[in-house]
Amino acid sequence: MPKKVDRTVRREAFLAAAYSMIKKHGISGVTARGVAAEAGFTTGALVHYVKSMDELLVEASEYAARDVRANMLEAEEEPNPLEALRGVLYLALASDADKRGNWNFFLGFWERSVHNAAVRKITHLRYEEWLKRLSRLIRRAKDEGQIGSDVDVTLAARSAMALIDGIAIQVLRSGKPPSTQTQRQLIDLWMEAWLGSKVRPPG
């Protein structure tokens, strides 16, 4: 009698393998054979679950987003809106090996989005989700009187997005990556310049 296969478990194994490999090696260094081997299965088994590398990339992106999204939702629960915003922005930094891996994954996603409509759609959705999250936090701070009534919420959110992207590029591509402390200082200075939020004391 054929062994019963738990399709959900096997699919998760493939997505976890793809996510792990892309974080380490980038998209160009990942093959269907490599993903299958990392997951402990054959390439033939993999093609039963995804039809192409682009489909695998899209699915792996959603897999990757789960933990990131959960951590950011938790940070949003901070009662102080500005500190919630600071916490969310800190989480987005390429400040440790795991987060640098996430950014390596996302940069590969950017590159692939130029050539693939499905990947491009997911990239746009991720940015839309990110913009909404930051706007929501800045609006909360504005509604609670923590920042000036003249602050343009959307413009401030977009400037924060641009800063985070720029920091990540410097970390991964400049050859002179800013330290975690420097990355956080840049966030603190942005909050002071754009929102009038005083920089927190060290520690």
Segments predicted by a language model, with ranges:
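C-terminal peripheral helix-coil segments that are non-catalytic and often amphipathic
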Residues: 87-94, 131-132, 136-140, 163, ...
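Hydrophobic alpha-helical connector segments
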Residues: 59, 73-103, 153-160, 184, ...
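Short, basic, alpha-helical segments at the C-terminal edge of helix-turn-helix-like DNA-binding modules
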Residues: 62-68
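Helix-loop "lid/cap" segments that line or gate small-molecule binding pockets
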Residues: 75, 90-97, 104-115, 189-194
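Helix-turn-helix
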Residues: 13, 17-59
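N-terminal intrinsically disordered/low-complexity leader segments
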Residues: 1-9, 199-203
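Amphipathic alpha-helical packing segments from all-alpha helical-bundle domains
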Residues: 98-107, 117-144, 155, 185
